[in-house]
């Protein structure tokens, strides 16, 4: 059975932080599904990239996926604003069950809501690092960081390293 990666997304995502990893995942032979507030709704990136949500967060089951991708931009902030905390709960399945979770730029913000960062080593864009540290993470300034099943990266400049590690983790 082909491995499938969930991508949680809202408006104002950083376009290249969605399109580049998604392309790398699919080129490696894996499937992706966009998960958002409403199935079949359009979400628009900061630079105009438009994508359609495949599955609503209400209907998504994390156990149906072999990995989780969280692109950056302002999308993670919007997702964290979900009154029911559904995106953090969804992500927690991956962090708690050693299923790969990939987050770049502002994406690691979602991982804060898993309450599973204490002692984990992560990276992120500069203005998210303090929040990660306050959540108990050991924060470093590296292009890509792997801590067990969590893979984090800083910015679009690091996408080559990030994409390579995503594919490596999915092929393991």
From Swiss-Prot:
Transmembrane segments: none annotated. It comes from Staphylococcus haemolyticus (strain JCSC1435). Pfam families: DJ-1_PfpI. Residues 3-171 form the PfpI endopeptidase domain. InterPro entries: C56_PfpI-like (IPR006286), Class_I_gatase-like (IPR029062), DJ-1/PfpI (IPR002818). Belongs to the peptidase C56 family. This is Uncharacterized protein SH1084.
């Amino acid at each position: 059975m082909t491995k499938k990666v969930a991508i949680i997304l809202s408006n104002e995502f950083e376009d290249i932080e969605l399109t580049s990893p998604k392309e790398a995942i699919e080129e490696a032979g894996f499937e992706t599904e966009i998960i958002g507030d409403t199935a079949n709704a359009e979400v628009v990136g900061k630079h105009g990239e438009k994508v359609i949500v495949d599955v609503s967060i209400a209907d998504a089951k994390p156990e149906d996926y072999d990995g989780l991708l969280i692109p950056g931009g302002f999308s993670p902030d919007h997702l964290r604003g979900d009154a029911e905390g559904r995106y953090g709960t969804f992500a927690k399945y991956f962090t708690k069950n050693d299923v790969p979770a990939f987050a770049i730029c502002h994406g690691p913000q979602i991982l804060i809501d898993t309450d599973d960062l204490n002692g984990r080593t992560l990276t992120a864009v500069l203005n998210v690092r303090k929040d990660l540290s306050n959540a108990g993470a050991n924060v470093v300034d590296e292009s890509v960081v792997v801590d067990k099943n969590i893979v984090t990266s800083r910015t679009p400049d690091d996408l080559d390293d990030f994409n390579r590690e995503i594919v490596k983790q999915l092929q393991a």
